[in-house]
Amino acid sequence: MANAVTFTYKNVNYTLDFDRNTAVLLEQQGFSVENVYTKPNTYVPMIFYYAFAKYHKHIKRNLVDEIFEKMPKKMELIKALVDLYLETGNTLFDEPTGDEGNLTWEQNG
């Protein structure tokens, strides 16, 4: 399981992470992982900006851009954000825990 990215900028603590809702917001903007590598000028800033949405949804874009400019180890950071994003899709296939009312399904045919 990937861990959220945390940092402090100008004495404010930030947490970058994704859940399925914020991943959907990112996808609705046309995001795909492949584009991070083929069209980085568009999609690297996009994934960085939307990583704020889970915990800091009202942050201004110009502040996010300022933070990104000063952020060290950008390649490692973007890889961590891609991993967090991909993990949200994996949760779609998690098996339920506990007794879910004995829900079962079958394919007829």
Predicted regions and their residues:
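Charged interaction scaffolds used for protein-protein
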Residues: 1-8, 23-24, 31-38, 58-109
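Short, isolated positions in well-ordered beta-strands
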Residues: 14-16
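Short, hydrophobic/amphipathic alpha-helical patches that form generic packing surfaces
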Residues: 43-54, 79-86
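Residue-level signal for threonine
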Residues: 19
